[in-house]
Amino acid sequence: MKSLNNKKGIILAGGNGSRLNPITLATSKQLIPIYNKPTIYYPLTTLMLGDIQNILIITTLKDQENYKTLLGNGNNWGMQIDYAVQEQPNGVAEAFIIAEKFIGEDRVSLILGDNLFFGQELSNLLKKFNLKNGASIFAYPVNDPERYGVVEFDRNFKVKGIVEKPKNPKSKYAITGLYMFDNKVIDYSKKLKPSKRGELEITELHEMYLRDEELKVNILGRATGWFDTGTFDSLHEASSLIKTLEKRQGLRIGYPEEVAWRNGWIDEDKLRTEAMKFSHNEYGKYLLTLIED
């Protein structure tokens, strides 16, 4: 598939979402609302901010139609959105094997469908993304690094290793759910063997690039916000924060129509058409203010 700008994106929205049962017995966790928008709008707009117009949504078979109903083929936002199925939760790295035809000869970014980012710092990094060789990941300081894949550094702050959920973390920098790769990621993924938990681990992909000295780690500062919204508490915290940012600070996050318009993918007439679909609520009214301003 030909890319609109030689960059492609994948949103991994599969999995069972068992930590959010019983809600996820009936729906995908990435369709659960975070404040006033479905969760998947947030990773989607993160990729859009990186000027990525070709996006593949990887879902379970039972949830795919719901995603198609919500997102369509992307034309309303000047994009191309395609879909693929991950039949079993066989690991994040399997996404690149599933997406081989979609990726073609392009470079690719992958974001986990339950990850929420915000902040101008990340937006600037994404816009500058022009990776031709190697891989680029994003690390964020956390208080509980044992819950995540962790980047370890030497005394000169050079990446020394990556450890998945270490019992005794040697670093506070967790690897977030946003990754950028060159085209070698397809072949590298095919070389992976299932881990002890039966999955193709994204951490092992990072280690392969690290051994080749082709892994770049971007440290995100406190000006950037990041949530892994895979638990009830984190969902509530993310919703509360988005509400506060929108109501008190006027900072709007996660509106695909707005990002598409600001990127020049749709014009004002198209933005107005999309806004009128929701003119009865605050979502649509906000989009209309963009034109009025």
Enumerate the predicted regions with their spans:
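Hydrophobic packing residues within well-ordered alpha-helices of enzyme cores
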Residues: 20, 67-71, 189, 238, ...
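Conserved donor-nucleotide/metal-binding helix-loop-beta segment in metal-dependent transferases, i.e.
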Residues: 119-146
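Conserved N-terminal catalytic core of the sugar/cofactor nucleotidyltransferase
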Residues: 1-11, 19-22, 32-33, 37-112, ...
